[in-house]
């Protein structure tokens, strides 16, 4: 449909505008450092689950301007020498990132991009687009997983997703967050995700009754989960499922029944009773119907007899918070001597003031307890493991502090690209999910609560904090002086 298309123009127009400014001013190759972070954990949660790195890599690997890209930019009025620069464009970025499945927190760098200024500027939109969506879905799935514990969680949201790409990559993100499988066949194929499908109400309506529909399904498929709420769950649907299961006997594997409507707590208890009394104690009860972590928590409080959870709309759309709000800010720029100079963005809102400098985030873990004590942000090049103790204090409320001893410090940001060359081996999706579970187990329970979690410590090294305060003072004075001169 769109020949010679590429994702390189998957960006905002002002990025191209700024690139041309940098090019015309001769500063497009100046070294710069940008960092991605979000200001508030999503869903009022205690953490987020990082996802999207694999798609960032796919995007950066193909970052070139096609002829149709250049023709289109020419039609917008960009000049010849700038277009020639774009024609010869070769990605030279150095990228560090959290690993997919890492638990990440507000106000810490989760992706860091370094390289020629114009190139850093170009990739902002796509990176934020990817991280904002996939991290949100992975976090939502993790919240649901924390409520259902070890029970199966299936992603059922494709038809409600915001178009096809969102369905595919959202499914993958949901698996990172803890989903066991999906109804999306293409996602199963692309990412080797287990797929599960039962049947819709349409099958029953086509045959006119549950009995004929269930028989037809059982004649075709050995593994059977019957949808029992088309007409009357307790008086027709479940008794008919039991009847067909008995008639077919060993010819089918009667896995259970699915409920998609009604009072799931009450109905599931009655269904469980019917299945048990009929001699099918191993048949599972599958539930769907606009579920999320809050609904499931409520159902569990009512002791609902549900074995498998199918979560669709409210997972794939991150229904209660459809945006993460991650931002991409410049933190350092090359000066006239070839050294990186720290930069800062000021704001009337304290939470929107950026933290200057190229940084590393260290996950501080107690050797004694094996639990994460907090994240400690230092300038790049500092090795926290050489320190016997750490002074950690809140960057806003500095009187809140603690000293940590006998710890291990692991860097959060790992090398993905070095000067345009991919140096990171992408793990499989199952490896990412296992890693995410391991990291989740290291978090104290008070940070994992679905409701009113405790704030996880994300602290600045004292020199960064002091430099930030000094830069705020310097930039305000400079801004006032410039304004006064006018």
PLM features: residue spans?
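Short coil/turn segments at secondary-structure boundaries
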Residues: 71-72, 139-143, 157, 448-455
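N-terminal, Lys/Arg-enriched amphipathic/low-complexity engagement segments
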Residues: 30-87
């Amino acid at each position: 449909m769109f020949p010679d298309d590429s994702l390189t123009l998957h960006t905002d127009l002002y990025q191209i505008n700024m690139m041309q400014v940098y090019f015309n001013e001769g500063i497009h190759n100046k070294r710069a450092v940008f960092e991605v972070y979000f200001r508030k954990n999503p869903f009022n949660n205690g953490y987020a689950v990082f996802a999207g790195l694999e798609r960032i890599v796919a995007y950066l690997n193909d970052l070139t301007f096609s002829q149709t890209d250049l023709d289109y930019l020419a039609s917008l009025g960009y000049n010849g020498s700038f277009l020639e620069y774009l024609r010869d464009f070769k990605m030279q970025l150095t990228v560090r990132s959290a690993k997919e499945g890492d638990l990440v927190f507000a106000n810490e760098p989760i992706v860091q991009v370094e390289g020629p200024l114009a190139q850093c500027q170009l990739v902002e939109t796509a990176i934020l687009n990817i991280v904002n969506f996939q991290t949100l879905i992975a976090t939502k799935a993790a919240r649901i997983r924390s409520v259902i514990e070890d029970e199966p969680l299936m992603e059922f949201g494709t038809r409600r997703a915001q178009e096809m790409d969102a369905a595919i990559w959202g499914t993958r993100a949901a698996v990172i967050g803890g989903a066991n499988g999906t109804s999306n066949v293409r996602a199963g194929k692309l990412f080797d995700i287990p797929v599960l499908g039962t049947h819709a109400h349409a099958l029953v309506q086509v045959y006119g009754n549950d009995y004929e529909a269930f028989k037809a399904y059982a004649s075709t498929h050995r593994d059977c989960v019957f949808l029992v709420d088309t007409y009357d769950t307790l008086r027709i649907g479940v008794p008919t499922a039991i009847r067909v299961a008995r008639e077919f006997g060993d010819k089918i594997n009667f896995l259970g029944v699915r409920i998609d409507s009604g009072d799931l707590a009450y109905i599931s208890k009655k269904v469980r009773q019917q299945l048990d009394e009929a001699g099918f104690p191993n048949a599972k009860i599958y539930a769907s119907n606009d579920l999320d972590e809050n609904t499931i928590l409520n159902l569990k409080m009512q002791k609902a007899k549900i074995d498998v959870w199918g979560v669709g709309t409210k997972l794939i759309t991150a229904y209660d918070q459809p945006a993460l709000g991650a931002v991409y800010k410049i933190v350092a720029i090359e000066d006239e001597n070839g050294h990186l100079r720290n930069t800062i963005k000021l704001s009337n809102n304290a939470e929107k003031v950026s933290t200057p400098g190229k940084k590393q985030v260290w996950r501080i873990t107690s050797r004694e307890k094996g639990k994460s004590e907090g994240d400690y942000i230092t300038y790049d090049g500092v090795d926290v493991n050489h320190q016997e103790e750490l002074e950690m204090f809140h960057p806003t409320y500095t009187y809140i502090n603690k000293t940590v001893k006998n710890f291990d410090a692991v860097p959060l940001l790992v090398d993905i690209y070095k000067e345009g060359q991919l140096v990171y081996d992408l793990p499989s999706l199952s490896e990412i999910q296992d890693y995410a579970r391991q990291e989740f187990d290291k978090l104290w329970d008070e940070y994992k609560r679905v409701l009113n979690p405790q704030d996880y410590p994300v602290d600045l090294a004292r020199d960064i904090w002091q430099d930030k305060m000094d830069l705020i003072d310097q930039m305000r004075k400079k801004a006032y002086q410039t304004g006064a001169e006018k």
